[in-house]
């Protein structure tokens, strides 16, 4: 059973309270599930999707075994600092932003292009507001700043404004609270890191999953555990091995660096494929236009992402001749495509007002040596252009921002202006990088994994980047974290229902025997 949320016209939330009988039922269920054998869910992956599923199951009274092959939880989610999309929200209302589920959905459909799956995008967008509410109310996250990222027609990307935010993205809060819960409630939640799942346990027809086998990497011991399974193992954009899905489906991408952690190797995809699970669009990989070039290690295989929030605040992309070449807030595939046509380096440039708006990001990137403050003379030297050439670029941009002329590249939202030669600039070199695998395991709108014949595989759920098809050909910035929460919660609800159904079936069988 779910708690519903009713919105008044001011979007202020009024809770719908379950009946006393419902509360009693869940209390009884929690007791029964905690004392029965094999009544746990197994969540694989400790990123935002896995943590969302885990905490949803715990809230519904279930027990969880949380496995992660890494030595720390968080996955790629702890790198995501631009924020999470949602519409409509109280924060948008307070800031007089007119947005809706339909507007968000339409933006997402346009971005997804021919590969759009309307039913999944409708699920994603319609549950976005409740996802942000859940993060705020369940974990105390303060989402009090809005950004307009590339491809969005309204500011709808929510993030916090804590001074340490780039160092503590929202996933860190879930990691911390989940680990504390495990320490205080070991009967409800067990966590095992350094645990690599090697096989899904199924019936002979592969249409029912009832557990997994995993290896403890610290001592190489093998273990078998039982329960419905939630796969939240991430994508495969860091797998450069000979048997990688990248090499098999998108080999040209292997020449690029990645923003992904080394744990993103498609393990979950391969396990699902081995039991006849369906996949979709494995050849589609999102190449993000702005990965920082580290001056200390320019050819590094792993690069830091230059968050899209920088361009949202007003950053421009300039060639080594001091010229713009694209709408900086166009879709990611468009900006990347324009960059790849160039023969010269590209620099991300913020004026002082834009840098102030994203000051915590700038602080972090500057600390890492990825960005540098400079005056116009040094900027011209860096770009290998004259002051007159830079002044011409700035003048055209400022006039377009004022509405005096159309922008040459169609940019509509300009952020902090004007750009002036007397200002101080924050600058970093950027290149396209592997960022997100669009393809993955095929699920329905309840996060249930489907077989190649289109049927639901009982007891197997997936959420996060392992899931394919949600974002079509091109993902909007801020929608990856949203998909983790929305489909993570759905997977958690599904795993809880499966535990209940199997518990009742087991109890009935025992009683009749």
From Swiss-Prot:
UniProt: FAD binding residues: 41-55
Name used for this protein in its record: Fumarate reductase
One term of GO molecular function: FMN binding
Record: active site: 288, 311
Cellular component, GO, one term: cytosol
Annotated GO biological process: fumarate metabolic process
Phosphoserine, modified sites: 100
UniProt xrefs under InterPro entries: FAD-dep_OxRdtase_2_FAD-bd (IPR003953), FAD-oxidoreductase_2 (IPR050315), FAD/NAD-bd_sf (IPR036188), Flavocytochrome_c (IPR010960), Succ_DH/fumarate_Rdtase_cat_sf (IPR027477)
The protein's role, per its UniProt record: Irreversibly catalyzes the reduction of fumarate to succinate.
Record's keyword terms, sorted: Cytoplasm, FAD, Flavoprotein, Mitochondrion, NAD, Nucleus, Oxidoreductase, Phosphoprotein
Cofactor or coenzyme needed: FAD
A Pfam family recorded for this sequence: FAD_binding_2
Subcellular location: Cytoplasm; Mitochondrion; Nucleus
Cofactor details (free text): Binds 1 FAD per monomer.
Lineage of the species this protein comes from: Eukaryota, Fungi, Dikarya, Ascomycota, Taphrinomycotina
